[in-house]
């Protein structure tokens, strides 16, 4: 039997019909171990216009640096109160906000160490395939040796860094395209 791959489709205006029940803007509960963080931002296109129908899918390790996934074989503890996953829709102004915990460092390839980060998939109208990026935390000492950040040109790394404001809320925006400040997206 020969199987044919299913084609990709844009998210379209109706994703909310089948996906809103999966929306979770608070990835950590009161019992989750780790430092609580809030991340807020906005999704805009290359002209700076609001993208008001985007959705962010967030994946991350727990505070010990372990993913709640069977392929993560690190000898680190799982947190029974943390799944490390959430879907976050934007509002009419393209804004989003979610709360979670700051993840621990994660083992990378060939014994390297990845800095604390969140993996973010961006879904939006007009995208045939979702976009993959990461959120790192500004000022995190482990950033200097992160193997993926080292591959990003120095002048573009800022697009991956969430910056804390005066209240301690991290700010991070998604710019879908353009020559000025486009968010770094990764192939996979």
Model-assigned labels for residue ranges:
Residues 1-188:
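Beta-strand-dominated extracellular/periplasmic modules and repeats
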């Amino acid at each position: 039997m020969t199987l044919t791959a299913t084609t990709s489709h844009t998210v379209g205006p109706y994703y909310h019909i089948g996906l809103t029940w999966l929306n979770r803007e608070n990835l950590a509960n009161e019992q989750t171990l780790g430092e609580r963080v809030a991340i807020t931002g906005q999704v805009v296109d290359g002209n700076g216009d609001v993208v008001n129908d985007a959705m962010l899918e967030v994946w991350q390790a727990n505070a010990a640096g372990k993913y709640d996934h069977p392929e993560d074989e690190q000898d680190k503890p799982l947190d029974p109160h943390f799944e490390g996953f959430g879907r976050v829709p934007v509002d009419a102004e393209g804004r989003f906000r979610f709360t979670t915990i700051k993840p621990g460092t994660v083992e990378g390839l060939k014994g390297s160490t990845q800095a604390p980060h969140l993996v973010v998939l961006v879904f939006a109208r007009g995208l045939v395939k979702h976009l993959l990026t990461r959120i790192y935390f500004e000022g995190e000492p482990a950033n200097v040796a992160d193997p993926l950040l080292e591959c990003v040109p120095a002048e573009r790394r800022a697009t991956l860094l969430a910056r804390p404001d005066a209240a301690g809320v991290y700010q991070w925006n998604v710019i879908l395209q353009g020559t000025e400040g486009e968010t770094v997206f990764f192939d996979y």
